[in-house]
Amino acid sequence: MPFTLGQRWISDTESELGLGTVVAVDARTVTLLFPSTGENRLYARSDSPVTRVMFNPGDTITSHDGWQMQVEEVKEENGLLTYIGTRLDTEESGVALREVFLDSKLVFSKPQDRLFAGQIDRMDRFALRYRARKYSSEQFRMPYSGLRGQRTSLIPHQLNIAHDVGRRHAPRVLLADEVGLGKTIEAGMILHQQLLSGAAERVLIIVPETLQHQWLVEMLRRFNLRFALFDDERYAEAQHDAYNPFDTEQLVICSLDFARRSKQRLEHLCEAEWDLLVVDEAHHLVWSEDAPSREYQAIEQLAEHVPGVLLLTATPEQLGMESHFARLRLLDPNRFHDFAQFVEEQKNYRPVADAVAMLLAGNKLSNDELNMLGEMIGEQDIEPLLQAANSNSEDAQSARQELVSMLMDRHGTSRVLFRNTRNGVKGFPKRELHTIKLPLPTQYQTAIKVSGIMGARKSAEDRARDMLYPERIYQEFEGDNATWWNFDPRVEWLMGYLTSHRSQKVLVICAKAATALQLEQVLREREGIRAAVFHEGMSIIERDRAAAWFAEEDTGAQVLLCSEIGSEGRNFQFASHMVMFDLPFNPDLLEQRIGRLDRIGQAHDIQIHVPYLEKTAQSVLVRWYHEGLDAFEHTCPTGRTIYDSVYNDLINYLASPDQTEGFDDLIKNCREQHEALKAQLEQGRDRLLEIHSNGGEKAQALAESIEEQDDDTNLIAFAMNLFDIIGINQDDRGDNMIVLTPSDHMLVPDFPGLSEDGITITFDREVALAREDAQFITWEHPLIRNGLDLILSGDTGSSTISLLKNKALPVGTLLVELIYVVEAQAPKQLQLNRFLPPTPVRMLLDKNGNNLAAQVEFETFNRQLNAVNRHTGSKLVNAVQQDVHAILQLGEAQIEKSARALIDAARNEADEKLSAELSRLEALRAVNPNIRDDELTAIESNRQQVMESLDQAGWRLDALRLIVVTHQ
């Protein structure tokens, strides 16, 4: 390779260095200085990864002084080039610019510039780039974008709510599903959609302190959303980095107590410009017209500053009318300002609910009923739809569904409130209780007596808590090394149960981590039982590994021993046997325990085993939960209310379990109260709201559509190709799982989402649900999205050369494959990609400008081509450069028509959809005050900005491939 001092070259492997200058040459090496970075590189002359920079007539070049020149002639003397042409700033002609004075910051970014500069990519990278463009564009156009990537079962009612709310501008809604129906998942789905589409960028989640880690885990494991947990320590640290500590993170979780405890902190939260606020357990925010609580006022203040608000709460019937009104008031204080007026409105919705029930029943409608429906809907031209609904035609069912939808749009709080009940959702298992009464060991009896004497001054509540866990009382006196498990009959029973049910996966829950750890040691040492442990002292990764070991069918752990806090947010529905080694203090925690297995999609009835010690608080509590509340075998929406009402009496019985006088009466009263409250709740159910929240056939179709997309084999092929080219090692572990690890030759040194130790992935939703250590890979997973960004944001694969062996064509025939991208630039919040994502347009031109792309499909053509090494490729490019220039000009002339057609189609679609949505909401606003003015304003503003952005849409050449025909 002939090198001369002063020549300009560019590095093939480090193009970001800009133009290099030859500053030293000897027999074996050459040294290049890259002035823009001040760095030197020493290369072997015989095989240096550099390309000579040579411009041609017609090119525009820049001098190191910054002025530009159109090249008209190129002269070479002693190996050095001089460019002659016209300056663009002064229009002076005949200007000479020696190559040594070229601008050193020059980087070849256009595909044609890279090709002519000899920066030729591997052929497989060009193919990957085109596929990345194609699939990326297709994914933006998918109707359920944002709903496919989460690690959740495809449950229709959850998808229905998320699909409805997630597409809205700044949604402000109340999610009030019954316990176990997945409010957290619904909220996560809405967040995922809003963040993925760009509708939201900053999110604040406020939860009770005990649920912070549960939310942190759920958001990361299910939705790949990495939230930061803010407590006093984190807040203090962040104050060093920013005036407002909350500006240091985009996604934040904090407790309600943390938010309201400090006035300055609350001000910082309000000023942090969140897009979405999520509040869990919102029913604990106490409100009355005269005296709202500090917690309620804190959330009210935040809700005034944050555009989107999701409140997760108990069902309206559990809350009571006034408390329910207080939640709605947080969402829209202008609409819900008068409680008495709200109560009156609710009464007026009964006829609407009756009308919906009438339509769904499928019976013939009388003329009076048809007239009533027409009046309620209040639309012109409704008559044909009413007639269709009342006919025997095939369209009758769809007409009735449309009428139901119109009724629900126009009446009630269905736009701001979503509520599903277990009665309305199928797929829940039965729950069967097995109680095992065991004698109280003498060691515990002695410890309890001594504790009673020494702890006489303790409160009844403290004594009650102690009595629930006799092993801890024993350890207080005997020390931490006391071997309580040697005589506790629950341990013997547990070992016997596990050894006789070796084939069953069993979840064992106890209150404390220490108990779980001690039980694991006993089971392992005495019976060789494989038991995983799960407690709050473990990191998320350690818990993942424990959960994965438990999930393994053949070689996995038979038992998972969980502490109360450690198991929050984790579900193990592949197991159906649960042992409660002790009992939790309140009914909410009991339901949370059972909820680890009692989920939609659980395939078997749940067997709940409760070994309890007689004459302890456990024996009191097991009876109260089962006989008083029926809380083991059914969900208990009344539990907390009754618990609060009998708290003092219950505590006394727990603190003194041997004094049982009157306990039977307490249980009887609780059962009567439970039945009465349950009947009251059932009577107050809002059927109209249930129908709307459930989604019916529409929701079922949504779930089926996403399930079909789960089987997309294009994703697997693309992902494997992507990982190969990035340089990620893949090790197939069987069971639809692959381990990815970084290699020594990565395209980038640190690939986002891939740790040094590697990660386990699966493309199978069922495997991902069973194996929490395996990440569920979809088009929406950060690993794929980061890979797409890496390829498409740089110049990987943007220029290449291939050989086509085809004896039907003359040797030396040239074809140029051009990949144009039609796109529009706009803020992410406009979600312009719904209408015009960056869309590839492929052209395959011969030297006469004939476009053969329609006749020659990309993948078929790609398989017929052979790669060319870089050295040969550079020679070929230099030989045919003029011809390629000519073909490029023909391509530029042809692309406009195709691009304009895409842009016009996008404009028409955007105008039609956004105008229709605006018209629909404006019409509904007349009859349903739950449609906010700011929502209408936002849609109109969004429509105008979208149309303006599409007017500015354009196109550019993204990649090209030069193809030369050969017969060899």
Swiss-Prot record:
The lineage of its organism: Bacteria, Pseudomonadati, Pseudomonadota, Gammaproteobacteria, Enterobacterales. Its EC number is 3.6.4.-. CDD domains: DEXDc_RapA, SF2_C_SNF. The keyword Transmembrane does not apply. A motif (DEAH box) lies at residues 280-283. GO terms for biological process: regulation of DNA-templated transcription. Residues 490-662 form the Helicase C-terminal domain. Interacts with the RNAP. Has a higher affinity for the core RNAP than for the holoenzyme. Its ATPase activity is stimulated by binding to RNAP. Belongs to the SNF2/RAD54 helicase family. RapA subfamily. Transcription regulator that activates transcription by stimulating RNA polymerase (RNAP) recycling in case of stress conditions such as supercoiled DNA or high salt concentrations. Probably acts by releasing the RNAP, when it is trapped or immobilized on tightly supercoiled DNA. Does not activate transcription on linear DNA. Probably not involved in DNA repair. This is RNA polymerase-associated protein RapA. One of its GO terms (molecular function) is helicase activity. Residues 164-334 form the Helicase ATP-binding domain. It comes from the Bacteria.
